[in-house]
Amino acid sequence: MWMIVLFDLPVVTPEERKTASRFRKNLLDQGFHMSQYSVYYRLLPGKEALDGYIKDIKAQLPPKGKVDVLAITDKQYEDIVSFSGKTKEKNKKKPTQLLLF
């Protein structure tokens, strides 16, 4: 399962820019990767982990702006079509999971 966080935060004043930067840094600290400047994603071990991450994000919400959280399956993630300029990028693949024993 994949978790995608999309947000649109105000960055007009220096304080708003600082708040938005802090929110982005918090996502990176939680293991999210930046897809676009306001779109971050991460692989979850299962649906059970989703609620914990949503709780953490809720605790870090800035006072203004909009934040959306999406949860998608591995298959839906692999079906994402991405372009860089006019060039289609390769389909995304789920990273292999390490087995520890």
What would you call each of these model-derived segments?
Residues 2-4, 10-101:
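Basic nucleic-acid-binding interfaces
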